[in-house]
Regions:
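Beta-strand-rich N-terminal accessory domains
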Residues: 1-51, 207-227
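Acidic (Asp/Glu-rich), glycine- and aromatic
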Residues: 115-151
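A short, structured loop/turn motif at beta-sheet edges
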Residues: 38-43, 72-83, 110-115, 144, ...
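Hydrophobic residues embedded in beta-strands of well-ordered beta-sheets
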Residues: 81-83, 116-118, 207-209, 229
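Active-site pocket scaffolds in enzymes
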Residues: 218-242
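Residue-level recognition of well-ordered beta-strand positions that form the cores
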Residues: 86-88, 104, 108-110, 119-123, ...
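Extended, loop-rich substrate-binding clefts of extracytoplasmic carbohydrate-active enzymes
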Residues: 49-113
Length: 242
């Protein structure tokens, strides 16, 4: 299993949900600089009393551990297996209070020939344009070696400089300032919570990030609609570049 999963069963996860596997980050993916967001020329302030948005700088949205998903398709054939689920965000008043854009999220997880594909569709059901800033937070690992033996490949040209708050300062630098060789960086030398853009893509518009161990290699393909990549790989010692 290449995913970090600390729960013995689905019941354990429902009893105390947390971040593991491949959670969806929505309706925004990363950290906001205030308890509000802006769209269509307006400021939308969060109601912090509701409890579903937390912190002075809210991060990762508020849908990561919700259980209102409805399975609409579950099948398999000789080569693959897949499950499709739908989340009607407009049905929950507390969600609409925080993000007043009626919409539906449909996700399909498909496993085929050693590849797990996650396809996501968002249907805007509101009368005005809806801001979209979703992401995914895969917790992955290799089993043939330790973190200190891994190398990573980051498919980007630009590294964003962050303040102590982990918010972008607006300054950027070439990725080579952080990784002299972005295609093979020794993870043991880094303590990463870093943002990268100007992704390098293949002919299908996908960017390829990789983690390599002794013999195993895990590749994460980033679809054409995603413009940036955050690498979160904290060093247990708390030391390293990044």
């Amino acid at each position: 299993n290449v995913f970090r999963w600390t729960y013995a069963s689905v019941a354990d996860f429902k009893a105390k949900p947390g971040m593991a596997g491949v959670p969806l980050l929505a309706p925004w993916a990363d950290i906001l600089d205030e308890q509000a967001f802006y769209a269509n020329g307006r400021r939308y302030a969060f109601d912090m009393e509701l409890g579903n948005v937390r912190g002075a700088r809210p991060g990762h949205g508020f849908l990561t551990t919700v259980d209102q998903w409805q399975v609409t398709d579950l099948r398999a054939d000789a080569r693959s297996a897949w499950v499709t689920s739908t989340l009607d965000v407009f049905r929950d008043p507390a969600w609409m209070q925080q993000f007043p854009f009626a919409h539906r999220i449909t996700m399909t997880y498909r496993l085929q020939e050693g590849v797990l594909e996650v396809a996501t569709a968002i249907e805007n059901l509101s009368a005005e344009p809806m801001p979209v800033s979703i992401g995914f937070h895969p917790y992955v690992k290799l089993t043939d070696s330790t973190r200190d033996e891994w190398t990573i490949s980051i498919p980007a040209k630009t590294h964003w400089l962050l303040a102590q708050t982990k918010l972008p300062t607006g300054e950027t630098e070439p990725i080579e300032r952080l990784f002299p060789d972005p295609q093979s960086a020794a993870l043991k030398d880094y303590n990463l919570d870093d943002v990268f853009t100007d992704l390098v893509r293949d002919g299908q518009g996908r960017a390829h990030a990789r983690i390599t161990g002794k013999a195993q290699q895990l590749e994460i393909l980033i679809g054409p609609n995603f413009r940036g990549l955050t690498v979160w790989a904290p060093n247990p010692s708390g030391t390293g570049l990044g």
